[in-house]
């Protein structure tokens, strides 16, 4: 899983959320129609929901359905001020015009009008609302929207309450957040693994334990940190001429090699303090597993672990340089070994 996969996931998430939260009217059908996605045509709201059951109510645009079939509003709404609908037609008309006639079909410019086959209009339901108090409205017979038309249309087939939509979006958001967390965790692990020295070339995680000092060496490290400036200065100008020299040069310079062996090979005895920056730690820097270091130290005193390490590195990587060797010594804080190494310059 890479960054491109993450971008695709985010794009799909945005599209799904846009679809789930879409509140737009139909882009295919007229005001009193809705898009039938199964038959891919426009059906009349009247044929699906029947005429408005309550007086002075009319159809909302596209009967509250979007082009995905989601219910984004109630199919019926109250007439605007000054408009009435006592006969239950599709749209309200001005109250002063007397009995409201059946309204003309409302066209929507720029929309396709492929009509579905006509179906019988369901009978008019009984209005579930109660009349308002006579003093609350100047128009007798006006009906309160306090109960809303939810009860009126909830029994209709295909109706889904708009209050259910946020509940349907919530699981989708949780799944997307979980996927995003997994992707970010995978990228973080890959970044950690790609850091040099984070694990050995042989995949042995135990070698990383040798990179960190034990509690008994904190005082020694403090003294080395105080001389950090001197260490950097030494590695910058005394070893500058040795950076490109091959590591195999040490095998020919026996005097320098012997001094390095005396500095780097020794490890403390059973009662001594824990050492840091020995040949064992240097081998870990070169990516050799801890088992190799244990075997190399088991050959002492007949064979030096440092000499075995240099021979192993040169055989495995002939292009290894003294500059890399000096860098590892500097990282381990072995100023004394760097001073000996500078004798080759």
Swiss-Prot record:
Recorded coiled-coil stretches: none
Glycosylation sites: 87
Disordered: region residues: 106-149
First and last residue of the signal peptide: 1-20
Biased composition (Polar residues): 136-149
Transmembrane segments: 164-184
Cytoplasmic side: 185-345
Principal cellular location given in the protein's record: membrane
Tissue/organ expression: Ubiquitously expressed with higher expression in lymph node. Highly expressed in T-cells and monocytes.
Extracellular side: 21-163
Function as written in the Swiss-Prot or TrEMBL entry: Probable cell membrane receptor for the IGF-like family protein IGFL.
Protein's name in the database: IGF-like family receptor 1
Native source organism of the sequence: Mus musculus (Mouse)
